[in-house]
């Protein structure tokens, strides 16, 4: 599909500076990214917000997905998850996959698409992406119209800018109430980070939404 190929040039320059898929020797500074219209799941009033910067073709990003589900099982209804697109130039199908997922998000079907894409990381051709979108339940006509628009590319470019501002150096990178975690880490690392973040948030004297807004206002660094 030509629509995916023409989109690649739009964002390529924005993705080439990132250096790794997996782990990095340096953690980024504390940062609570603005959520805006990014896909979210979990309670809006959760004490803990986890922002994920990820690439749909990155094997480490796919590897950590079952662990994230385990976090929800271990700490039910305690985390609001937020996704930010970060397709790396080393992965030629990551950007088309992000565009496909963002167009599913327009129909409130981002998370079914997210699950499908990570379950089929070796099947991200144009035709496969359309099959995944159909499996996720999207209206295909509206989805195709979205693919031909600038909106998903603009969203991805904005997510990329947020990643640069946050000094993200690898995918996946997570910010747990602003505290960074990088890579496909063990379950215990995520649970410990969530527990510590929740305790600190509850001691703040603020409501959950107010607390995250306060973190955002501090900026990155």
Where are these regions (language model features)?
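C-terminal cap of thioredoxin/glutaredoxin-like
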Residues: 2-3, 131-221
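Bacterial signal peptide processing site
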Residues: 22-24
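N-terminal low-complexity, Pro/Thr/Ser-rich intrinsically disordered segments
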Residues: 27-37, 208-211
């Amino acid at each position: 599909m030509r629509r995916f190929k023409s989109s690649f040039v739009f964002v390529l320059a924005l993705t080439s500076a990132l250096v790794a898929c997996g782990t990095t020797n340096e953690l980024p500074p504390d940062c609570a990214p603005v959520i805006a219209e990014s896909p979210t799941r979990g309670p809006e009033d959760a004490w803990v917000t986890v922002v994920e910067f990820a690439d749909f073709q990155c094997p480490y990003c796919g590897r950590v997905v079952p662990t994230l589900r385990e976090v929800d099982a271990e700490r039910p209804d305690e985390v609001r998850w937020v996704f930010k697109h970060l397709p790396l130039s080393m992965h030629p199908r990551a950007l088309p996959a992000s565009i496909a997922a963002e167009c599913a998000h327009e129909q409130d079907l981002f998370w079914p698409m997210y699950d499908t894409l990570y379950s089929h990381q070796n099947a991200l051709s144009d035709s496969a992406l359309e099959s995944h979108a159909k499996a996720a339940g999207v209206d295909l006509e509206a989805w195709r119209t979205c693919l031909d628009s600038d909106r998903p590319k603009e969203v991805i470019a904005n997510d990329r800018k947020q990643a640069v501002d946050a000094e993200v150096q690898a995918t996946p990178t997570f910010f747990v109430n602003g505290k960074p975690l990088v890579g496909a880490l063990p379950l215990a690392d995520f649970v410990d980070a969530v527990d510590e973040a929740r305790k600190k948030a509850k001691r703040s004297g603020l409501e959950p939404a107010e607390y995250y807004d306060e973190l955002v206002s501090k900026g990155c660094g």
